[in-house]
Amino acid sequence: MAGRPTGGPQGAPSHDLLLDLENDQPVYGGGQRSTLNDDDLMRTYTRDQESGQDQGRPSVSYDDFIGAGQSRQHGTGSQPGGPGQSSSSNNNNNNNVSAPYSRSGRQYSQTSDLGNYQRYADDFDDYPADGDSFYQQGGALNGGGADAAARHNARNRNSVLTMGGGFFGKMKNRLGMGQGYSEMDLPLTEPGGGGGGAGGGGHSRADSSGIDPPKRDKKFDMGNFKFGFGRSKPDPSTLGPRIIHLNNPPANAANKYVNNHVSTAKYNIATFLPKFLLEQFSKIANVFFLFTAALQQIPGLSPTNRFTTIIPLVAVLMVSAGKELVEDYRRKQADAALNTSRAQVLRGSTFEETKWINVAVGDIVRVESEEPFPADIVLLASSEPEGLCYIETANLDGETNLKIKQALPETSQMVSSSELSRLGGRMKSEQPNSSLYTYEATLTMQTGGGEKELPLNPEQLLLRGATLRNTPWIHGVVVFTGHETKLMRNATAAPIKRTKVEKKLNTLVLLLVGILMVLSIISTVGDLIIRRVEGDAISYLMLDQPDTAGKIAETFFKDMVTYWVLFSSLVPISLFVTVEMVKYWHGILINDDLDMYYDRNDTPANCRTSNLVEELGMVEFVFSDKTGTLTCNMMEFKQASIAGIQYADEVPEDRRATIQDGVEVGLHDYKRLKENRKNHSSAPAIDHFLALLATCHTVIPEKGDEKGGKIKYQAASPDEGALVDGAATLGYTFTDRKPKAVFIEVDGQTLEYELLAVCEFNSTRKRMSTIYRCPDGVIRVYCKGADTVILERLNENNPHVEQTLTHLEEYASEGLRTLCLAMREVSEQEFQEWNQVYEKAATTVGGNRAEELDKASEMIEHDFFLLGATAIEDRLQDGVPETIHTLQEANIKVWVLTGDRQETAINIGMSCKLLSEEMMLLIINEESAAATRDNIEKKLEAIRAQGDRTIELETLALVIDGKSLTYALEKDLEKMFLDLAIMCKAVICCRVSPLQKALVVKLVKKYQKESILLAIGDGANDVSMIQAAHIGVGISGEEGLQAARSADVSIAQFRFLKKLLLVHGAWSYQRVAKTILYSFYKNITLYMTQFWYTFRNVFSGAVIYESWTLTFYNVFYTVLPPLALGILDQFISARLLDRYPQLYSMGQQNQFFRMKVFIEWLLNAVYHSIILYVFGELIWHGDLILENGQIAGHWMWGTALYAPVLLTVLGKAGLVTSNWTKYHVIAIPGSMAIWWIFIAVYGTVAPMIPFSPEFHGIVPKLYSSPIFWLQSFALAILCLLRDFAWKYAKRMYRPESYHHIQEIQKYNIQDYRPRMEQFQKAIRKVRQVQRMRKQRGYAFSQADESQARVLQAYDTTQNRGRYGEMTSSRPQGQGT
């Protein structure tokens, strides 16, 4: 079809087109894959970038992606024998068949002129002729039923071991690490006979001339070897079309196509355990703990109990597994809601309601207005004339304008279920692929004279993800289901994302492991020295004295194991489960935030991936879709300028019309317009203006059943619908349409306008004209379009041009979409002469018909009289301008990536305050790579040359279209383009494809490695962008939920992004950072005292604390403070974080979790451990003698030292707490109370079991000792005194920015900003009056389609038949 992706032209004819098969996709000459598979392109690009290969980026612009030009007609496309084949291809005459399409009797079809070759076997005679339909045969199959059909249509399928690249490839796919969904391994069809397999003897593969195809040289292929598992790859010659039997469910079931089940869940029963364990042990800390647990099992080497590591590790994994299962259960619930949606499927001669999951390939379904399509469907018939229907693809490509699809004339009459049940035949469809806008198939129908083969193309394909609009119902046959639908083929498996904090955490863990190694080596060397130097003096310890190299090595190994286990808790095992729980609760807080709840459609925020919450506080780039994300998809006719006079639906008091210097300025309301239409000098202009709005369009009126009911307009463009509604509001109501006339009602009188010709809109012309014979008999040309093309076609006698231009500037400054309206009268002779030229152009055969039509249109579109201009508001979502302004204040760069045209995107940029009046627009809109490079280089040179003198980077905004972006994303130009884009405050990319959206995100991610990227969108076309970014946010609510279901967080409105980032993001980042640092601190403090003790116990490896007391340190005694800090701490209130968005930069700069901060916490922990151990040693020096004369002993001293350590780390938690709540009181002082109570119980019960005999009698002695209580509080105060002094000095003499805000919060200091903002708004209004904008957009959004075909097909004056069809569309006397 139209538009070829950038992949180069078709190469020379090849006799070996299909070389190999990998992952069920054909590979083409030269080993290059089809450029249409987004997944493969993204993976190839990522691999090339990582390997450093200098290859161009596979970028496909929006226009190339969907086809911007007119559809090209293939000369062979309408002939029988398969799509794209000529009739001669079905005979033995190959003279007319080019080499790429035919080799040795095989036919190939080039899918929609896009180089995506699909092999079509010419031995279709092996398939049984479908006689009558399955239902007409009484539910029986010819030849023995389904089993026989299955044997006859044997399919050479991949085995479980060979699909997806062998056993390991299959396992990777099942674990979600392969190239797509685990369910997306597609079966390959093979037309074979008699159960013959690939290469079996079912039938001969020779062509009709009896010449065998040339044999390929067999070469060894590791991919074929499969490591000894399964069988080799299937022969590519087995590829054939998908055969779908009409009204024959058993025959289709025998083919075992994938079902219509769609899953976005991360796990299933089989994959949960291996995938979960693989993900968990990709974390360095978990591998470390597993290794330590293994060392503890070595008898005689571990100084602690052998289960003190493995049990906490299992507990951590269990908690993580529970969290993962809960989150995956939510995904499964969302999938179940979709899979259990209701659809109407033909069963027998009636439509029965069933679940989407039960819809199968070959089913005939009925879809009604406003319903989404349950699968990929080929349109058979609709309620509209000529089999037309409107669909909305906003969830696929982001476009809100309706697309027109049309059924084949041969099937468009099948409007009743009984007619459909008698439909017999088969479809030969291309294999599933990811191209949204191409499709080739043939439909073979049973007719009275035999079979009739009809070509199918994208005009008949209705995709899953699209929605039926403005059409009561359609009938269609399902061709692709589930993960084989084009929507799901364009989706990618959700990647496992690692946060910046998590990566830094792994680095810190490695650092602590390094410290652990150093401590272990120091202790081991100390032990060896003590054994050698002091061995005789301490012979009573019976220590071995290694005297040989082997003995030394053995002792060294044993000591290293001992000390590794002893110091292993420097890495807190509870940290990771604590962080998991903290992040999980952050997700709950996001979900439960009523400020982000959208009550209009009962949609709360939903954090689907809580692992990423802290990165919400570190975002530097936001990539946003426009349609449905920034806007509401609702067009409203707001203002009009007619004959130099402005009219509006609502007129503010300060803008009401007044007379100044004899000139009327300001706005009139619509009431005044109706008065002027009757008795004002501008009445003729008003009449033609409103008549143009009511007639020059492609809108179809739909009347209600009741007489006098409100007319509903079916508009392919929301702009046109708004204009026609506006005309109706002003008294010119469009009522009916005939193929050659339109009818409007004015003042109760019906007027007929005879349609003579249509000059269609396209993106080059930027205008649309209709030629009517008006009710007064005069022929007039009505034209509407962009001001740039209308104004240059005006005659000299136009008195209102200047006033209209002024009004256009005002509309553009308000972000409204504008159109200019003009007309001219044409004599009968001039029209007849022109019409001959136009008819000749319309019948031109060849590729230049569109050009000839444009030339013919130019001949009559001149000397116009300007009637006025319209202003349409593409209403933004509530709060969008304020949100974008706040994000920019927070130093977040906002890039808008949209499929809309450049003018529309700029308009929206102005409306949402992404672009401001002070900004200088840098526009790149080139047609070649060289021109794009030259444009970018000149702009960069100009910026760098000016420096800080005349150009402020804050005033620059970049606007680039899809074609230029294609060139800019090439490898040799991408860095230069990114340098220019980074210099700009705002970037708008127009006419971009879904693939380009993802590539732009990948480009920024590649070069801005330290930046966090967030992508937000609402449609399926945004999924690849969402998954490419560090954080994906989906807009849920009005449209489909594909983006929301694939995102990490979903919200209902764009404005909620402000609180999500500035409040929840900032809180999460600060909380997670504080939780991690505190967890490291508390463990280092405790276990460094153990290290200092090794110098006292002659490096014997003895422990200072009882084993289970050590274990319970992280599990019970210090588990609550990190949770309180991580879940409840608020370093700044939500109100002030919103008021001062500049605070957000702290997360961008990673102020709370950089290496410097970690070192400070580490040194602080070491300092505390030294104070605690040294003073504890001094207090208990020589074993303190108790009141009863007994010596305290080793275990009593260790337990006494444990108390001040615990009190110190809990006191530190109190010092770093920003706001105290009752939960902080429970968590921090409460934890100390827990220890005092627990140690009393444990010290009493454990020795009695006996479980810990060394604790016998210790607790009574400790609790009765005043030295114990004095030491506990005195040492804690001594340690924390330095911390308190440092905190005081920091706030008083070197405060951070947030310290000032905390003071404002504490003392409730009033802010002057509200008054300042009011003053700034007043200044902006003054500037808007003083300055006129040059950028204006025009309000056409429909695709470049054939409007004439629509206008000349409808006759709304006819009544509908029994099934809602037009009575004129059914042959007379035909039954139902």
Curated annotation (Swiss-Prot):
Annotated keywords: ATP-binding, Cell membrane, Glycoprotein, Golgi apparatus, Magnesium, Membrane, Metal-binding, Nucleotide-binding, Translocase, Transmembrane, Transmembrane helix
Disordered: region residues: 1-151, 180-217
Transmembrane parts of this sequence: 307-327, 510-530, 560-580, 1108-1128, 1166-1186, 1191-1211, 1225-1245, 1258-1278
Disulfide bonds: none
Location within or outside the cell: Cell membrane; Golgi apparatus, trans-Golgi network membrane
Organism: Verticillium dahliae (strain VdLs.17 / ATCC MYA-4575 / FGSC 10137) (Verticillium wilt)
Cofactors named for this entry: Mg(2+)
Composition skew (Low complexity), residue ranges: 85-96
Entry membrane topology: Multi-pass membrane protein
SUPFAM superfamilies for the chain: Calcium ATPase, transduction domain A, Calcium ATPase, transmembrane domain M, HAD-like, Metal cation-transporting ATPase, ATP-binding domain N
Superkingdom per UniProt: Eukaryota
Residue positions binding a 1,2-diacyl-sn-glycero-3-phospho-(1D-myo-inositol 4-phosphate): 1212, 1282, 1286-1287, 1298-1299
Positions contributing to Mg(2+) binding: 625, 627, 1018, 1022
UniProt keyword Manganese present: no
Glycan attachment points: 339, 433, 490, 679, 762, 1083
Biased composition (Polar residues): 97-115
Residue spans, topological domain Extracellular: 328-509, 581-1107, 1187-1190, 1246-1257
Disruption phenotype: Reduces the amount of toxins sulfacetamide (SFA) and fumonisin B1 (FB1) secreted from cells. Decreases cell population growth, conidia formation, conidial germination rate. Abolishes microsclerotia formation and severely disrupts melanin production. Decreases virulence in cotton and thale cress.
Cytoplasmic side: 1-306, 531-559, 1129-1165, 1212-1224, 1279-1376
Keyword Transport: no
Protein name: Phospholipid-transporting ATPase DRS2
Broad EC category: translocase
Assigned GO CC terms: plasma membrane; trans-Golgi network membrane
Active site (UniProt): 625
